Amino acid sequence: VVRGNDGKYYLYYCLAGEKGSGGYNGPVSVAVCDKPDGKYEYLGYVKNRDGSPFDKFVCFDPAVINDGGVIRLYYGTSMPKGMCLPRFVRKAASPIFEKIYGKSKAEITSEPGIWGANTVTLCDDMQTVKTAAVRIIPEKTKGTSFESHAFFEGSSIRKINGKYYFIYSSQKNH
């Protein structure tokens, strides 16, 4: 839950399952309330400026922060440890991934790929994406400071004493 610039509170979530409109293949949904402890009402989904659902990369496990009036949405998921697949395997498995993630073969096999931790800035309406998606942690972590703690899911963002902390579940699940 995050307080918008309008003083209302916004809850971001992903629906899963056949009856939901999200999960691994849909948009991030938004609910709104006048107080942080509910009762929230469905507002809509995070969308592009043209009104279409925002679905760059895999939209999953959203977290939002109001950073001095700038609304930032963090989201994403990746393959579990041991399942980070080379490009040729992604290409061969793309029909399965297309169904699970609702992404095209081109999106799945291209670089940087559909998996990873990402961020966008939202407009004051708390739904419309203002900036292009940016990958904040590399999917391929070998040789980086993330090598032992590659991103899996569970985006959470904090700002403490002017420093940002991105907290997540790693592929080692800790």
Regions found by a protein language model. Name each.
Residues 1-174:
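Carbohydrate-active catalytic/glycan-binding domains of CAZyme proteins
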